């Protein structure tokens, strides 16, 4: 089980300056030294490198685009197999209602339970309805990861209306809730922790210096 506390997402996509399994492993080490209780990472290669540096539990994903589908986070059994081979403790997958490239969400959950019963499963959702559905499918964790990132939640953001969406998810599901997506300040982290989430994933605000730099620049340029 993931412990309570801060999980740091250490990811860099191919078009980003820090794209490297070695760099992500050192980012994870820095997060561990700073007090993180877990890591979220993308690709089998990154996860294997990270596990060489830290013994923290890892939430694993594989981001891969499929034609005709907007689902790209651990979309099929192919990605699941890669994550099982990586040895990660938790597999996270897109649990939205968007068109899937291959297996149904229910089929993927069953596949993981059958093939790797020791691995926990996290649902990345964007609506309360998706959270309730994930709860019915017996996901171990439900994360607010994709709020604002699906076509039907575009324009929304996790912290709007004093985290109203997160509060509703917490109220409606029995699974452990993970706050993720635009938790961008220590104050926000404290707020969601006080609301009762099991743990919180913070990524860009800690591990993406390009984004952090842009935020500083934008603050000065705003009139």
Swiss-Prot record:
Pfam families: NanE
InterPro entries on file: Aldolase_TIM, NanE, RibuloseP-bd_barrel
Pathway assignment: Amino-sugar metabolism; N-acetylneuraminate degradation; D-fructose 6-phosphate from N-acetylneuraminate: step 3/5
Reactions the enzyme catalyzes: an N-acyl-D-glucosamine 6-phosphate = an N-acyl-D-mannosamine 6-phosphate
Keywords: Carbohydrate metabolism, Isomerase
Keyword Isomerase: yes
GO MF entry, a single one: N-acylglucosamine-6-phosphate 2-epimerase activity
Membrane-crossing segments per the record: none
Known EC number: 5.1.3.9
GO biological process: carbohydrate metabolic process; N-acetylmannosamine catabolic process; N-acetylneuraminate catabolic process
Gene Ontology CC annotations of this record: cytosol
Gene3D superfamilies recorded: Aldolase class I (3.20.20.70)
Top-level taxon of origin: Bacteria
SUPFAM superfamilies: Ribulose-phoshate binding barrel
NCBIfam families the UniProt entry points to: PRK01130.1
Task performed by this protein: Converts N-acetylmannosamine-6-phosphate (ManNAc-6-P) to N-acetylglucosamine-6-phosphate (GlcNAc-6-P).
Stated family: Belongs to the NanE family.
Name used for this protein in its record: Putative N-acetylmannosamine-6-phosphate 2-epimerase
Organism, as annotated: Staphylococcus haemolyticus (strain JCSC1435)
